């Protein structure tokens, strides 16, 4: 039995085209190019995220449209660097909690090109930063440490990277100093909870 057999009948399952399921492109082709009109209230559910599970099992958190609008406005006005249609960002944090989801919504809100990674791979992250002239990224300290441990890290081009957002766990002064030395950009410590949308 597959996961799709367990889902309610009114559930649409979109995959990369495995047997019996629609590929995203096929599903999209079945619908009009213009989105349907919708009346959305600010307190309507926008996204269900999950807590990190720091104090127990992860818990579901329903965030509203106004939660994410406020987060996006705050991020775009508090950020010392611009983010718009002429910039790029990388998302390598999981999308089930605020670190990844907040970065994704910020990218959509600001209009910047957003590169989504299925999983964190430090070498691929660095390649994307170079090739796509990435200006900002969110990483937890463990990710920053993994990037810094790449053998050729000092030879890589981070000239377009203007800010690294980090959080979710403490970072040592040694790691932070090394990261600033290598990336040569602003580091912005984030603190928030999924329950408060950041």
Where are these regions (language model features)?
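Conserved S/T- and glycine-rich ATP-binding loop of Class I adenylate-forming
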Residues: 45, 51-54, 62, 89, ...
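Conserved AMP-binding/adenylation subdomain of ANL enzymes
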Residues: 69-88, 96-136, 150
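Short beta-strand->loop structural element characteristic of the AMP-binding/adenylate-forming
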Residues: 1-2, 59-62, 91, 113-120, ...
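Adenylate-forming
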Residues: 27-28, 51, 68
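ANL superfamily adenylate-forming
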Residues: 2-42
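Gly/Ser/Thr-rich phosphate-binding loop
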Residues: 109, 134-139, 148-198
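Short hydrophobic/charged patches on amphipathic alpha-helices used for structural packing
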Residues: 37, 123-126, 145, 153-155
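Conserved pre-ATP/AMP-binding loop-to-beta segment of ANL
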Residues: 31-50, 57, 82-88
